[in-house]
């Protein structure tokens, strides 16, 4: 799959098929269909969002997911103990256990993102993943919703994440479009332009 180049303030198109048919999409589809068949979507989807929040908010948890030096049985036991202590249901715990045994834990955040996109598509919504250097204010959320509506995204579910490495600005991904107005991207572009001028 070719990696798109994103220009600050611009957009790029990323293949939706690669998300739906890739490994995260296959696992997410399996979880969605299992939950739908068992009438557990109202339980599983909020818990998947809570798990994504746990991953985003805890550096140790993220490190555990990507650590390939630990024994998989130990990692699985530790993860399931954390999920049990946090009150996650049996479906999510079992799903994470399967992912762990299949040695796909590093893909768990992408799987949860794909699940979010699948659920939104089933509801007829677009998911706007917004990454900012600082948490958005209520005014910024309203302005962002308005801008997205102007761009033709009338039913948008905004999912926010904070990444201080952006330094400023936003990175917004809606469906196959990526809008990058982050200061980090602008500085990178300036750096490359200055290297080319030398």
Curated annotation (Swiss-Prot):
Molecular function terms from GO: proton-transporting ATP synthase activity, rotational mechanism
Q: Which Pfam families match?
A: OSCP
What's an example GO cellular component term for this entry? proton-transporting ATP synthase complex
Q: Where in the cell is it found?
A: Cell inner membrane
Would the keyword Membrane be found if you checked this record's keyword annotation?
A: yes
- Primary localization: membrane
Entries under PANTHER family matching the protein? ATP SYNTHASE DELTA CHAIN
Q: What does this protein do?
A: F(1)F(0) ATP synthase produces ATP from ADP in the presence of a proton or sodium gradient. F-type ATPases consist of two structural domains, F(1) containing the extramembraneous catalytic core and F(0) containing the membrane proton channel, linked together by a central stalk and a peripheral stalk. During catalysis, ATP synthesis in the catalytic domain of F(1) is coupled via a rotary mechanism of the central stalk subunits to proton translocation. This protein is part of the stalk that links CF(0) to CF(1). It either transmits conformational changes from CF(0) to CF(1) or is implicated in proton conduction.
* Similarity section: Belongs to the ATPase delta chain family.
The entry describes its oligomerization and partners as:
F-type ATPases have 2 components, F(1) - the catalytic core - and F(0) - the membrane proton channel. F(1) has five subunits: alpha(3), beta(3), gamma(1), delta(1), epsilon(1). F(0) has three main subunits: a(1), b(2) and c(10-14). The alpha and beta chains form an alternating ring which encloses part of the gamma chain. F(1) is attached to F(0) by a central stalk formed by the gamma and epsilon chains, while a peripheral stalk is formed by the delta and b chains.
What name does this protein carry?
Answer: ATP synthase subunit delta
What is the scientific name of the source organism? Gluconacetobacter diazotrophicus (strain ATCC 49037 / DSM 5601 / CCUG 37298 / CIP 103539 / LMG 7603 / PAl5)
Per the record, the gene is: atpH
């Amino acid at each position: 799959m070719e990696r798109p180049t994103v220009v600050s303030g611009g957009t790029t198109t990323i293949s939706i098929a690669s998300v739906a048919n890739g490994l995260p999409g296959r696992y997410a589809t399996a979880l969605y269909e299992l939950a739908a068949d068992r009438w557990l979507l109202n339980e599983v989807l909020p818990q998947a969002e809570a798990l994504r929040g746990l991953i985003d908010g805890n550096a140790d948890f993220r490190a555990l997911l990507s650590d390939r030096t630990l024994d998989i049985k130990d990692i699985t036991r530790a993860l399931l103990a954390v999920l049990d202590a946090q009150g996650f249901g049996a479906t999510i715990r079992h799903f994470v256990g399967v992912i762990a045994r299949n040695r796909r834990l590093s893909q768990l955040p992408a799987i949860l993102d794909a699940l979010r996109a699948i659920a939104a598509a089933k509801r007829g919504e677009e998911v706007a993943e917004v990454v900012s250097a600082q948490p958005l204010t209520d005014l910024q959320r309203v302005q962002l919703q308005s801008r997205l509506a102007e761009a033709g995204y009338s039913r948008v579910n905004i999912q926010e994440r904070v990444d201080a490495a952006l330094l400023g600005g936003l990175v917004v991904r809606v469906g196959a479009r990526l809008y990058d107005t982050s200061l980090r991207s602008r500085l990178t572009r300036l750096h490359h332009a200055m290297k080319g001028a030398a």
